[in-house]
Amino acid sequence: MKQGSLYEALFQIGALIFVVIVVHATYVTVIRPNADLIQEQQQLLQQQDENFVPERSVFIILRDFEQETCIILMLWAIAIISMKTQHTLRERALLDRTLIQLQDGVSILPEDSRNYSRPVQALSSKEREFLLPRALLAGLHRFQSTENIQAVSSIVKDTCESEADRMETELTIVRYIAWAIPSIGFLGTVRGIGTALGQAYQAVSGDIVGVTQSLGVAFNSTFVALVVSILLMFLLHQLQLLQDRLVLDCQNYCDARLIRHMQVPEKNEKS
């Protein structure tokens, strides 16, 4: 588990550095030069024709630093979500395998727990860290030590619930990003409106170009931030749904293929 946590931390740091480099390079070489060129052309056409209505350009909408930051955070969060989705799908693949070898009509007795746990222990070290093997091994070990089926059910449930809590905690950084993106967009709105108010004297004299550009910064940053936030929250909820289903399916797997077949000898039940 410690190696997995270290890998995730290194992945997140590496993904952030990679995204920052790629997005900033794209802005410097593509988005901002094209936005400046389009804006100059629109200003020239407006000077020639007062009735000219400029078209909204994607480059102009995305050009400011607030939008760049929002896109960086979105791509970083998507990388984290993709990593966790891939890990969850690998865990789900174990649900299609028969880890407890049982013949029809055969019951699991406390003294048989060690034998039935061997196929699970034979899994690779990475697979043994998955939820399903941990829940199965915890149930078999508890059954061997307590000879109590209710105790097995409790330990399986506790294992699944603790895993659900861990998954919930590990998504904290993604939730923070989803909260931070609209906030950054509103910072752009405040900056744009503040700049527009500072140029109000130009509008009084008839020059409204500076004011309209500043208001464009305000509205574009909010627009991009809200769109990015909607997309990110959708992906986050899909991941949460996938993880919740994994926990429930693992618990059902243990109930159907392990606990249901357990049996305590009558002498132990009486004692």
Q: What role is predicted for each listed range?
A:
Residues 70-73, 127, 131, 147, ...:
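Charged, alpha-helix-enriched surfaces in structured cytosolic catalytic cores
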Residues 14, 18, 69-82, 184-187, ...:
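Lipid-exposed faces of alpha-helical membrane segments in multi-pass integral membrane proteins
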Residues 19-37, 84, 184-204:
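Juxtamembrane "helix exit" motif at the C-terminal ends of alpha-helical transmembrane segments
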Residues 4, 153, 157, 206-271:
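Channel- or pocket-lining gating/hinge segments that regulate access to a cavity or pore
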Residues 29, 33, 81-92, 196-199, ...:
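Membrane-spanning helices that line or support transport/gating and their immediate boundary helices
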Residues 2-9, 13, 25-160, 264-271:
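Large intracellular
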Residues 163:
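Cys/His-clustered metal-coordination modules, chiefly Zn-binding fingers
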